[in-house]
Amino acid sequence: ADCSATGDTCDHTKKCCDDCYTCRCGTPWGANCRCDYYKARCDT
């Protein structure tokens, strides 16, 4: 799957953080994870 754009919300329908980034905000499909450029940040 293609990566979502920077800032897009990551959920179970968007694999961008798993496929092209490293996203670990509690769970692999962190509800509060957002894609960032080459990284992920947690929105708390």
Curated annotation (Swiss-Prot):
Tell me which domain of life the UniProt entry assigns to the organism this sequence originates from. Answer: Eukaryota
Q: Does the keyword Lipoprotein apply?
A: yes
Q: What does this protein do?
A: Toxin that inhibits presynaptic voltage-gated calcium channel (Cav) in Drosophila nerve terminals, most likely through specific block of the Cav2 channel (known as Dmca1A).
The protein's PTM annotation reads:
Contains 5 disulfide bonds.
- Name recorded for this polypeptide: Omega-plectoxin-Pt1a
Free-text comment about domains: The presence of a 'disulfide through disulfide knot' structurally defines this protein as a knottin.
Family assignment? Answer: Belongs to the neurotoxin 02 (plectoxin) family. 02 (plectoxin) subfamily.
Localization recorded for this chain is: Secreted
O-palmitoyl threonine lipid modification positions: 44
Starting at the broadest rank, the lineage of the source organism is: Eukaryota, Metazoa, Ecdysozoa, Arthropoda, Chelicerata
Threonine amide is found on: 44
Q: Which UniProt keywords apply?
A: Amidation, Calcium channel impairing toxin, Disulfide bond, Ion channel impairing toxin, Knottin, Lipoprotein, Neurotoxin, Palmitate, Presynaptic neurotoxin, Secreted, Toxin, Voltage-gated calcium channel impairing toxin
